[in-house]
Amino acid sequence: MNKGRVTQIMGPVVDVKFDGGKLPEIYNALTVKQSNENGSMNLTFEVALHLGDDTVRTVAMSSTDGLVRGTEVEDTGKAISVPVGDVTLGRVFNVLGDAIDLDGELPADVHRDPIHRQAPAFEELSTKVEILETGIKVVDLLAPYIKGGKIGLFGGAGVGKTVLIQELINNIAQEHGGISVFAGVGERTREGNDLYHEMSDSGVIKKTAMVFGQMNEPPGARQRVALTGLTMAEHFRDEQGQDVLLFIDNIFRFTQAGSEVSALLGRMPSAVGYQPTLATEMGQLQERITSTNKGSITSIQAVYVPADDYTDPAPATTFAHLDATTNLERRLTQMGIYPAVDPLASTSRALSPEIVGEEHYEVARQVQQTLQRYKELQDIIAILGMDELSEEDKLVVHRARRIQFFLSQNFHVAEQFTGQKGSYVPVKNTVSGFKEILEGKYDDLPEDAFRLVGGIEEVIENAKKMMA
């Protein structure tokens, strides 16, 4: 076993000297196991740089409090490896793949995969573009997700990012029998705890593996925890042929953690103080998230935008990789429209006639045109009232309000709060429902009948009850 000694400690960055000229490889995991009067210490470092002939610079995966120079360090001879397979479902892990829930240790012989690996080879990639049906009307109609695609989820605090994530996990599990992996990267521990309990209550946890590296942890853990989650997802894709959902909350914290250690590793900062390797690190992570001939990983990434500045290097680098964006809007929550997805700001490169078909594309564009015209007319309505509008514009407003309400629906995972049964709406029902509204087939039904329903048949039922 190759052993070295700690020579320098700079917060989360630790230098280790190896005698005999046998240096551990880049990305190898080094461990410290020792006991002293302050208790036992069990640390893992990852090799980041080689300094000269006998010293490596490493990044710690947990706090270095109590570590002293001269401490003996062992080279494990391999990268950090984490458990993979069905044994991970329903469990919660840290960056090293240790179980941190209260359900006991994993079996000793559990299969482990290294967190660093190459993106799939070019010839393994799947070229066919396939839509991932979510059962959520506003997403499927206006900003559809692609299997193996990357989706950015934008929204402030309390607008429903977590509930939307839970519903997606639920629908993929129930309708497609799919598996989800949730990576909590640098977010609040309280939110992770709440999510775990909510998912346990709704029964979704049985089809989900969860990995956390939260705000209070050192940057090494926050930077690598996304790779831990991704490695678990890759196993389900490559070994079991699954279509996996990978949730990363929040992708900005991955970049932020990299920038924290970058200067300590001796790199010159680049724009806005970010690490010079920002685009490379992001690319290495994102390129592994893709569809292959065996299965797919579809990634939904919450994106925090610092100071709402979309030109900041961190969100700007993320955008380059996204196939679709789902924007959540507080204004819609205030109107009681859930999910509060902004139908005009959300985009998808899959919304083209070649991918979704001519009818779907036409209906989606007409819905957006109607809503856009309604938005333009709102100032006139606020100042002069509805009576000043032309008959044509009155009809636009009339239909736009019905469309706006019909874009809302009840979620399965929110049943315990709302008391209303959740609904999963197939894409073809969604398209035909909106097409009929645009054609004026339901102009005579009260607009409240369209609120928080599934398919168009529920609207007709509601209207009958209201008119009875």
UniProtKB/Swiss-Prot annotation:
It comes from the Bacteria. It catalyses: ATP + H2O + 4 H(+)(in) = ADP + phosphate + 5 H(+)(out). It is a peripheral membrane protein. SUPFAM superfamilies: C-terminal domain of alpha and beta subunits of F1 ATP synthase (SSF47917), N-terminal domain of alpha and beta subunits of F1 ATP synthase (SSF50615), P-loop containing nucleoside triphosphate hydrolases (SSF52540). InterPro entries: AAA+_ATPase, ATP-synt_VA_C, ATP_synth_F1_bsu, ATPase_a/bsu_AS, ATPase_alpha/beta_chains, ATPase_F1/V1/A1_a/bsu_N, ATPase_F1/V1/A1_a/bsu_N_sf, ATPase_F1/V1/A1_a/bsu_nucl-bd. Belongs to the ATPase alpha/beta chains family. This is ATP synthase subunit beta. The gene is atpD.
